[in-house]
């Protein structure tokens, strides 16, 4: 079920403070808050999202508003299925 509209979008307040303080800066903003919703104030900023191991820099554009930060930094790596072992013999 989607979140109630009367509650509004969820975002971590410390992330918004970082975005507002880095208004003219080109350095990426590091965050572990994958659960925060992208707000219009974040458009144009580069946010480095933690995936559990590394930080992945993501440039925020207008199409991303309303989505969560975690959607743009995958946490699992798919190595592919094993090939057919019989064909090598």
Swiss-Prot record:
GO terms for cellular component: cytoplasm; small ribosomal subunit. The keyword Amino-acid biosynthesis does not apply. One of its GO terms (molecular function) is structural constituent of ribosome. GO terms for biological process: ribosomal small subunit assembly; translation. Keywords: Ribonucleoprotein, Ribosomal protein, RNA-binding, rRNA-binding. The keyword Signal does not apply. InterPro entries: Ribosomal_uS19 (IPR002222), Ribosomal_uS19_bac-type (IPR005732), Ribosomal_uS19_CS (IPR020934), Ribosomal_uS19_SF (IPR023575). Belongs to the universal ribosomal protein uS19 family. Protein S19 forms a complex with S13 that binds strongly to the 16S ribosomal RNA. HAMAP family: Ribosomal_uS19. This is Small ribosomal subunit protein uS19. It comes from Xylella fastidiosa (strain Temecula1 / ATCC 700964). The gene is rpsS.
